[in-house]
Structures are given as C-alpha cells and as structure tokens.
Amino acid sequence: MRAKNGPGSWLALTAIATSLNTLALAAAKTINHSYEFNPVVVSGGGYITGIIAHPTEKNLLYARTDIGGTYRWNADEDKWIPLNDFISGADENLLGTESVALDPNDPDRLYLAQGRYLNSENSAFFVSQDRGATFDVYPAPFKMGANELGRNNGERLAVNPFKTDELWMGTRDAGLMVSEDGAQTWRNVSGFPQANANGIGIYWVIFDPRSEGTVYVGVGVPGGIYVTRDSGESWEAVPGQPVEWDEDILVFPAESQPQSTGPQPMKGVLAENGALYVTYADAPGPYGVTYGGVYVYNTTSSAWTNITPKTNNSFPAPFDNQTFPAGGFCGISVDSKNPERLVVVSLDRDPGPALDSMYLSHDGGKSWKDVSQLSTPSGSGGYWGHPIEEAAFKDGTAVPWLSFNWGPQWGGYGAPSPVRGLTKFGWWMTAVVIDPSDSDHVLYGTGATIWATDNLSKVDKNQSPGWYIQAQGIEESVALALASPNGGDSHLLTGLGDINGYRYGDLDVPQPMFDLPVLSNLNALDWAGQKPEIIIRAGPCGHNYTDGCGLAAYSADGGSSWTKFATCIPGINTSSSNPGVIAIDASGKDIVWSSAMTAYWPTLQAITPRTNQSGPYVTTDLGQTWVSPTGLNVQTPNISADRVQPRTFYSFTDGTWYLSRDGGLSYRAYKAKEVGLPAYSGALPIANFNRAGEIWLGLGDHGIYHTRNFGKKWTKITGRGVTARQLTIGAGARRSSEPTLFIVGKAASHGALSKDGVYRSDDNGKTWVRVNDEKHQYGGIAMIQGDPRVYGRVYLGTGGRGIIYADIKE
C-alpha cells in the first residue's frame, strides 16, 4: 500500500527510524575487517651495510641493514622484499642483520645472523630453506652488533661449500665459532688466535672453494689475516701481509696520524684465480676512518702487492685540492666472469672536497678508473655526485629527498651536496656488488639508499654510466613524529631520524624533504585544528642560523615552505640534540614549546631532562618572544592542543591534569583523584578533531580514560586487560559520530586479544579487534597515528622499518 503524506504517516516513519537506530546502536560493535599493510614510501632512509649475491642463481640478491633486517630482491616485481617483519617488539634487538650467508650449492638456503647491539643478550640465527619466505629461529650463544662499529665489514658468516650444514662465524667477542648442524648449535675453534681482537673481533670468513679445508679469516687488527689448511686444526698468519703503513699512503702524517699501527683488513674477496683482494683502513668504520689501502695476495706464490688507487695509477687523477687524509677503503667486489675486474670504494673522505670514490680495474688493480669522478658533471670542485635527475627508479619515479634540499651541513654523514643540482655520489659506500649474472650491473649501498647501473662498462670509454635508484621496497627509517591533519592536500606528515621529514598526499611515492631549515632529526610535529594548512615542526639542526632559530619552523601552506622561528626557547640552541615537543592551538596563533620529550626508542634518542624552572613556553608572535606560564612549572612532553577550541591546551603530568584556556599563558591544575583519573606519571592528551573538550588518555595498564568536558570529569571506558601504551584516534565508521580508537598494547587479559599488537575500537573502547598479525610486527610499533579522513586507516611508526600504513581491505 502506498504511504500517504500526513502527520500520522510522519510519526509512524519517525518511530520506525528511531527504532532502527536504537537497534543499530544496541548491536554496534567493532567489525573485524581484514587489513593490508603497505609502506609510506621513502625508499631507503638508512644505512645499507651489505649486498650479497648468490654466485650462480640469477637475480638472487640480498641487502642487509643495521637496524631494519634483511631484504631479498624480487626481479619480477622490481623491488626488495622485507624478510623480517615477523619480529615482535619484545625481540626488537633482532631487527638488525650482522651478517648474511648463502649456500653456494643450494640457492634456497639462507642464513641470517641477527642482533643489533652488544648490550643485549638477544641474538639469533634465522635459517630459511625457501629464500626467506619462512625461518627457523635458533638463539645464538654469543652477542651480535648489527648497529655497532664494524658493521660495514664482512661477511662474518660463511657456509662451507664442501659441507652444506657447516657454517663458520667470526664473532665480536667470542672468537671463531663453528656449527655443524645448520646454525642450531655452535662450538668455539679454540686454537684460533686473536679471538677478541680490538674489541670488534673477526670481520670476515672466506672458504677456498678450490681446496677443502682451506679457510681465510680476517681480524680487525694489523696483520690480522689468518689461514688454516686443515679445517681449523692449525692456523698461521698469512705471510707477507701488510703490518705497517706504506709511506705513500700517509698523505699528511704530520697533521693526522693513523689510528692504528698498521692497516686493518676490512673486507676480503677470493677470486677464482686464487687472488685474495683485501681492503684496509685504520679504524673499524663506518665512521672515523682516515687512512687505508687495497692489497692483493697471490695464494699460489704467497706474494702481496699494494694496488691502492692513487695519483700514479688512476684516471682521472685524484682531486688536486684535497687537503685532508684520503680515508680508507672497505667496499669491494670482483667480477665472477673475470677475476682481474673488480671495484673498490673508499671510506670516509667526507666532508670533501674529493668525496668517496668507486674505482674500477680491469687488470687486477694495476690501474684504475675513478667511477665517481667520471659520473660527476664537470665543475663540481671535487664534490662527486649524481645529477639529481638520476635520483629516480628505473621507471622514472623520482626520489627527490636525496637532494637534502642542498641545505647547510648539520655535522653528520650524509649532509647535502654543496653543489646545487647534485646529490652526493654516496657516503658509507661499503656495500657494493658486481652482479654475477650481469657484469655491467653494479649496485652499491650508501648511508641512505642503493644506487645501480646497467652499463658500468661506459667507464672504459671515460664516460659516465647511467645511474638509477634500486632501493624500492627498502624502508629503513626511524619514525620520530607522525601527524595526520583533518584537511588539506596532505594525509600524513612525518618526522624521521637522520633524514628530516616529509608531507604525503600520495603515500606510495617518495616525496621531497621539508624545505629549510633541514633537520637531521625531526622530533616534533603539530597542525592547527581549524587551519590544518598551518604546521609547526622541531628537531636538531646543528647549523647556527643568524636569522632565526634553526631548530623549529612554521608553515602556512601545508608544509610547502617554511619560516624559522625568530628565536628558540630558553635552554634550546644549536647544540641541542633533542628539541622537545611543540604544539599549536586550533586557530594557529598560539604555540607552546617544551624542552622535554619522550624516548620512543631508548637506544636511538634520549629524553631531554625536564626542569622545574618553567612550564612549556608560549609565543603569540612566531617566536619573537617566549613567555613562561603560570600554574604549570615543569617542562613536560605530555602537552597538546584542543583541535576545535582556540587558545586551549592540555597536559597530564606527574599525576595532575592541567587545562589552559588563555593560549598557554596560565594553567589550572586538577589532581588526578579529583577528576576521576588514577595516579599515573603522565600521558599525551589525544583531542577529538571534531568536538571541543573531548579528550582521551592512554594510561598503560590502567586502560583508556575519556572526557567530554575539558578534563573536569574522566571516565574509564575500557574493561579489564586493556593496556594502552600508545593511543590515537581516526575517522569513525560509517554512520558513526564517534572517532575510531587505536592502541598499541593489549585488548584483553586472556585469549587472542591478549597478544601485544595494534588494536582498533569503533565503539569508544567497548569492543576491540586486532589490526596487525604475527607477520606484521616490524620489531615493535613505537607510535601510531589515525587518519581523520579515512576510516580504519592507521599509520605505524617503527624503529627501523620506516612507516607502515594499514588499510582495511576493500
């Protein structure tokens, strides 16, 4: 029957609608959607410590990193595949690869030696029979240091080509170890000398495939190369090896003495003709090296030859204005098809001029071509580099951040090229490989990415090869700050360790760095709730700007351009490594800056000590003046702004709730018990982006607390077992007026939801579902950020695997 228009009909329809809405609300719960995980693309972002190629299997390449695990190259998809994302937060130390070993007789076998730091007992061997698709994990009886000094050397781990289950491992502090059961158990080679040499230990182990029982081992001391010809029963120092510095290498001995009494063997490669090529330096690296060389040992005649690239044997000649020690050598690779064709790379010639060079030889090192010089446009003044146009994937997708915006050096490796239009040829280029299946294809890693060429032979004609970025799929950055505005062109703003920060409209494409000032770390970000185009950021700079504070800046155009604050707050200056936290009110006019900050990754950044001299400073004139507030007299990291109501700031610090309604000039204090909060050290207030005065607090094992009246009365909204170490909000579900909650922690005291992970709630904490799974743990999640415009999306900040965005599968 057709409905009639009239009061009775309207009331009936209203009653039906109301009834349906009531039923919907009563039945509302968090839907357990499936998720997909993708990287927020930087492409690289960290140090590539090794690139290892299988000697016979085409396109089987692995890249190891110091804090991001290992990747395998997938030629079909033209990208690197991360292999260690299953590592949990509890096993964070395992997300760093000390060494990679491949079985020359079985390309499916892969061995990874995992462990970041020597101060952790948690190290292990990951053993795969399927190229890293799955692993068996065996605890290691010794420590590893994938992010320690000497991580540039290797490989420390090697498979015996004559006994497929036998591996040898040169350790840092436990001597030479042998496993005869595929890395499950280990025994010490008790007769090996120099077991704990130099505090760094053994750098590399090489089996001679021509002679069963012959093994060469390189130790990080002068004269540190040893050989056994009876599988380790007896050892001798390789005779004739360099133990003192060649006078030709000591470029400026009066001004800068080597740090060791003689050359230390960094890497070794045994060519098929029996030539053992060795690179040398005066320190373990990857930083602090000042001298070094390259030698070759004829294993048949026992003769050593100095083949170091220098003035009389390389073309073009070394840069004539070089006024500092020439650095050492580390990276090396030999062509599998021609044992006299090899590349070597210098180490630590930074800051230049005459930066680190890659050299190519066709005659076993008698003569060299300087690949870096030949690849650099003329007129660079010795600052070798690629034209920025070459900083792109093979398909032409640009990786623009590698310019570093040509900003002033901040005092660390990887600073921008001083030549506008160039990106540095590289630094820490200790990982280099000539592809065994294609001698023209060469890859080299840097402190930031992987470069490659398919026509290295152009160097033979004194021409530049064509270079491109081959790092797609590798995401090794450390997340320090995340923000997702509720409007504008950018869905995500990021702050990263070592490489500044970025704004993303397209999450799948590399972006330019934020403009000057370039921050070596970007630790703090915020946006104005009612004017999301206004953004502020802060981080260490290291450059003494005379026209303002280089540690903090604001943007009025969504991050396209930036202006430095006129001055820094008291206690923050050029030498500050931790700039604290910064927040901006909803109108974009009031800014507070606290010198205290939270250490998300204790091994990577420290907490700036809090002081009781002042609370968070406030400015209304973009840093011309800073005012100390009343009512809050401690520098706290737990401060944020209301996203809707201007001039309103919140803080929960040392068991006290603070509320400011005058732009941070004064705060009213409420003891936790008075407003319904538990006794707790403090937490960052999370403000609703749509409703003034609505806030959430994630209080660890105490769960989540919620207020709708600016914190004057709080209610616990979670049940027993909910642990919220990190908390964020995002866009609500369809037809819901409530934002979605995300936590890092646990959502129950037992059962499936009691596992540590990332969880989502669509009904303000009543019910939860897990977002990630055991395959997507990334060594732990340090920070999370919901997206105010995309339901279900959450950004995951990691400590070595970059930033991941998790979306509900369509």
UniProtKB/Swiss-Prot annotation:
Spans of repeat BNR: 126-135, 226-236, 359-369, 554-564, 617-626, 658-667, 705-716, 759-769
Residues with glycosylation annotation: N32, N188, N298, N312, N321, N455, N544, N573, N612, N638
Compartment(s): Secreted
Cystine residue pairs: none
Transmembrane feature ranges: none
Domain of life, source organism: Eukaryota
Cited Gene3D superfamilies: YVTN repeat-like/Quinoprotein amine dehydrogenase
UniProt GO MF annotations: oligoxyloglucan reducing-end-specific cellobiohydrolase activity
Enzymatic reactions: Hydrolysis of cellobiose from the reducing end of xyloglucans consisting of a beta-(1->4)-linked glucan carrying alpha-D-xylosyl groups on O-6 of the glucose residues. To be a substrate, the first residue must be unsubstituted, the second residue may bear a xylosyl group, whether further glycosylated or not, and the third residue, which becomes the new terminus by the action of the enzyme, is preferably xylosylated, but this xylose residue must not be further substituted
One GO CC term on file: extracellular region
E.C. number: 3.2.1.150
Function, as annotated: Oligoxyloglucan-reducing end-specific xyloglucanase involved in degradation of xyloglucans. Releases the first two glycosyl segments from oligoxyloglucans. Active against cotton xyloglucan, tamarind xyloglucan and tamarind xyloglucan oligomers.
PANTHER family: OLIGOXYLOGLUCAN-REDUCING END-SPECIFIC XYLOGLUCANASE-RELATED (PTHR43739:SF2), XYLOGLUCANASE (EUROFUNG) (PTHR43739)
Protein name as catalogued: Oligoxyloglucan-reducing end-specific xyloglucanase
Species this protein is from: Emericella nidulans (strain FGSC A4 / ATCC 38163 / CBS 112.46 / NRRL 194 / M139)
